[in-house]
A protein has these predicted regions:
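Structural signature of the two symmetry-related core transmembrane helices
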Residues: 56-71, 250-265
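Transmembrane alpha-helix termini and helix-breaking/packing motifs in multi-pass membrane transporters
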Residues: 15-21, 125-146, 209-213, 323-342
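Cytoplasmic helix-loop-helix junction between adjacent transmembrane helices
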Residues: 88-119
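Helix-loop boundary and gating motifs at the non-cytosolic
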Residues: 1-40, 183-226
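Symmetry-related core transmembrane helices of the 12-TM Major Facilitator Superfamily/SLC fold
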Residues: 143-162, 338-355
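Hydrophobic core of transmembrane alpha-helices in multi-pass small-molecule transporters
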Residues: 78-95, 194, 273-290
Length: 376
């Protein structure tokens, strides 16, 4: 939760901060175009490091984030945006791959929802606070945010340090149980993760930018993003209930319906009130999709003893195609194309999710497992 406080102050507003500090949307787009593929690449490049020192990387991942925060106080240039992208992607990879691996071995579907709820609660207040701070005197307020954020990241590592022994034992156990799985059944999950990555980046990155350029202030964007977190909390509780009742596909159906309505609405209207409603609707759709599908993926990789490779490639696929989403902006400076793609992607996600959750052949087949030698 403490980490979520800090993330809400920097990660949520990073493209907006670059845009406002430079008064140039292209700098924000350059950052995003570099950030997404770098995340996919670093997942694969740092695979062995994450495999051996996963718990340590979770503890130290905030270091590049703190560097970014103080670099933000310099004059923004295109090459500085590339440095931001490299440091932010490094922090992303150092944290989420090992964390998801711990989930795959120690957690169950109920705890996926609980973790998401804690994250949403952590973001809620600080998104509003950051939006109002940055909406005032930008130069001084940015320094306040960066210093506060640095302190929070340091504090967030303390609980992990206290539980280091237990976490390391669980992590090493997960890595040792991992194997390389030779099966075509992961193709559906790979496709789903590409589609999910596109949806996620529209919700978490493009939506705040879209709201801001539609004449909404920093404060207004912050309020909308906070409302989205409130909606996510409720949706996580509902998703947890539906998954427990073995109604995962119903959760996905509700998610896809909300997603489709939201994208269609944003393409039709730019009315501020309707943007609030459609944004919240889009926020509701995220947990209702994430919780059942992530739980299904965990069940799959645990069954196949494919913990580490499964999680590593999951993250790589999620980030693999995101960079292409920003290319249309260089031709036409608007986000209409991204919302059209989101609308189409909603239907694709629904179809892929249906195939995964109802793949009877996959449930029955014996999967060939090839042991992987783990480097000591």
């Amino acid at each position: 939760m403490i980490k979520a406080f800090a993330d809400s102050m920097i990660k949520v507003f990073m493209p907006l901060i670059i845009y406002k500090a430079s008064n140039n949307m292209l700098f924000a787009i350059i950052y995003l175009c570099a950030f997404e593929p770098l995340c996919a690449l670093l997942n694969l490049v740092l695979k062995k490091v994450l495999q051996k020192y996963g718990v340590i990387t979770i503890i130290i991942h905030f270091i590049p984030l703190i560097v970014v925060q103080f670099l933000l106080n310099l004059k923004i240039t295109w090459w500085l945006c590339l440095i931001f992208a490299l440091l932010m992607s490094l922090a992303e990879v150092l944290y989420y791959v090992p964390l998801n691996l711990l989930f795959s071995f120690t957690d169950r579907k109920v705890n996926v929802a609980k973790f998401q709820i804690a994250t949403n609660v952590g973001k809620l207040v600080f998104i509003v606070l950051t939006g109002f701070i940055l909406g005032s005197n930008f130069t001084n307020s940015l320094l306040i945010v960066t210093v506060t954020c640095s302190v929070l990241y340091l504090l967030s590592s303390i609980p992990i340090l206290f539980g280091y022994g237990v976490l390391k034992k669980s992590y090493n156990k997960a890595v040792k149980h991992s194997r390389v799985v030779n099966t075509k059944s992961y193709k559906l999950f790979n496709l789903y993760h590409i589609e999910f990555g596109i949806f996620q980046v529209i919700l978490e990155v493009i939506l705040p930018l879209y709201l801001y350029i539609n004449n909404l202030t920093f404060q207004s964007v912050a309020i909308i993003m906070a409302l989205i977190e409130v909606c996510k909390i409720g949706a996580n509780i509902l998703a947890k209930f539906l998954v427990n009742k073995k109604l995962s596909f119903l959760s996905v159906i509700i998610s896809i319906s909300a997603m489709t309505i939201s994208f269609a609405g944003m393409l039709i209207s730019t009315n501020p009130l309707l943007l609030y409603i459609f944004s919240c609707c889009l926020g509701i759709s995220f947990p209702l999709l994430f919780v059942p599908m992530f739980s299904s993926f965990i069940k799959k990789i645990v069954k196949d003893h494919n913990h580490f490779d499964g999680m590593t490639y999951r993250e790589a696929y999620i980030f693999s195609c995101r960079g292409f989403l920003y290319v249309p902006y260089f031709v036409v400076p608007s986000f209409t194309a991204q919302f059209i793609l989101g609308f189409v992607c909603a239907g694709c996600i629904g179809f892929t999710s249906y195939k995964i959750l109802n793949d009877k052949k996959n449930k029955k087949q014996t999967i060939e497992v090839i042991p992987q030698r783990i480097n000591e």
